[in-house]
Amino acid sequence: MYIRELSLRDFRSWPECTVTLEPGVTLFVGRNGFGKTNIVEAIGYVAHLGSHRVFHDSALVRQGKESARVSVTAVNHGRELTAHLLIKAKGANQAQINRTRLKSPRELLGVVKTVLFSPEDLSLVRGDPAERRRYLDHVIATRKPRLGGVKADYDKVLRQRNSLLKTAGAALRRGYGADDGALSTLDVWDSQLARLGGQLIHARHSVVRELGPLVHDAYARIAPESRPAHIRYVSTVPFADVVELPSPEEFEAAMLAELGQCRDKEIDRGVSLVGPHRDDLDVVLGDYPAKGFASHGETWSMCLSLRLAEFHLLRNDGTDPVLILDDVFAELDTQRREKLVSVTAEAEQVLITAAVGDDLPDTLTESAVHRHFVSVADTPEGRISLLDAATGVPHDG
């Protein structure tokens, strides 16, 4: 897969931007704060319906505007599709493919496939469990877009159930019994949460089983002198670690039973304590968790291994994802830079952002790449980003 054209309107610092892209390596060069990361962030947003930098869509809309528009034309095995996304500062986003309006932006999942390396990847090891859950869910939704909808539905049911738990806890504290209306309704929400949660837990266990060997091999290539790396999924819904993975229905039954066991504690705390929203991905080096025990270099090697495993897993499915390297070379030592560059030779398209050319490995600067230069200009509406403003044409090397 490769992206043939990207068009932005009022996305962060870009009032307008249209750039034609080609297979191979494309480099966006610009000083920090000039807006080069915003370009690849827009592509990643269309791919995953989320930003790797912020949690709220309002930050993506240029100051003073009500909405932003991102259009990405992707070519996959000769078939061309254009994904359009209208991002609103307030209200629901809208999406379409070519000229067809979609019922939900979630229907865009799978149209554009990307794997992003960025400085924020350190959170995959050092961050909270939510970062690692998000990593797994992105991989799952890219491969099976339907499960992206399951995750969204689960989050909605979870919010409603947590609200009910707070109501039930307040009722008990006021002296009402277990037959109070709010409390009796929990059974219905438990069933819905377990049905959706069982599907998510099964999907995560399944993808971790596939990613595990890829992570191990990638880490061994990047850091052959280090301890072996492996990953494992840790769930609040226990099951016997057997060769054959339990079905979604079996996970659903196990989760429902666990919810029953924890009901009193959940009502007391007013929060759901069981389910995929409480799970984690253990990242292990040797016999110790990488978080807290890995050196800075080992942490970066593990983060790269997780992303490389993601890339190869999607590639094994039959489609080369677009590889995005966002200001990541500046964070790596020479050895890790070269290991990462070796992967770029395998990808159909690579998009790279860098503040200065010195951040790039020699093997990359010597290869044929398409270069674009990002600058800024001050206007009455504020500072805006410009692409190739000096000449008005792309710079190829």
Curated annotation (Swiss-Prot):
Cellular component aspect of the GO annotation: cytoplasm
Q: Which residues bind ATP?
A: 30-37
Source domain of life: Bacteria
User: Is DNA damage tagged as a keyword?
Assistant: yes
Q: Which GO terms describe its molecular function?
A: ATP binding; single-stranded DNA binding
PROSITE patterns named among the record's database cross-references: RECF_1, RECF_2
Q: Tell where it localizes.
A: Cytoplasm
Q: Which NCBIfam families match?
A: recf (TIGR00611)
Q: Which PANTHER family does the UniProt record give?
A: DNA REPLICATION AND REPAIR PROTEIN RECF
Q: What is the name listed in the Swiss-Prot or TrEMBL entry for this protein?
A: DNA replication and repair protein RecF
Name of the gene this protein is made from: recF
